Amino acid sequence: MRIEELDAEAAERELPALAAIMRACVEGGASVNFVLPFTQADSEAWWRRAVLPALRDGERRLLVARVEGRILGTVQLAFAPQPNQPHRAEVTKLLVHPDGRRLGLGRALMTRLEEMARASGRRLLILDTVEGSAAQRLYESLGWTLLGVVPRFALSTDRTVLGGSAFFWNELR
């Protein structure tokens, strides 16, 4: 496994792989702001619209996890835009392709992301995830603090359930 940072140009070259990870995760029920149907084209459009410009502008950083050269995981660090919060960032879109599960990719991505945040002068990180999910258990095992759960926060990908979202914070030392 290799964790690496992609800039906007590298991310654009890897767009099909990044979009495939997101599509596979959404199809598998991951609540990452999308509902079914969710196509490869939908995923690529989101990456082009939301991520690539933010990478170019320095508002976001992107990590990927490769296994035998194949990108199987990704996570993003979005810097707080508020002038009074230069110490804060949000962790977004921790995604691991089903083919990469149970290999420690999520943990490795989060560990590297925290190192990257520290090096960028960020000391307070926030994130949210589906209540009761494997991601929630991962964040708890990494020492993140549960702020609370907002009930009925977001629809499931199949639009049948309004599920709770667990909000976490982590003060980096």
Residue ranges and their predicted role:
Residues 110, 117-130:
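Conserved GNAT acetyl-CoA-binding A-motif
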Residues 101, 118, 140:
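Short polybasic/polar patches that bind polyanions
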Residues 97-99, 103:
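Active-site acidic-Proline motif in GNAT/NAT acetyltransferases
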Residues 4-93, 97, 110-112, 116, ...:
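Acetyl-CoA-dependent GNAT
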Residues 43, 113, 118, 135, ...:
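Short secondary-structure boundary/hinge segments and terminal tails
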Residues 2, 11, 89, 123, ...:
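C-terminal "cap" of GNAT-fold acetyltransferases
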Residues 103, 107, 111:
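Residues forming the Rossmann-fold NAD(P)(H) cofactor-binding site
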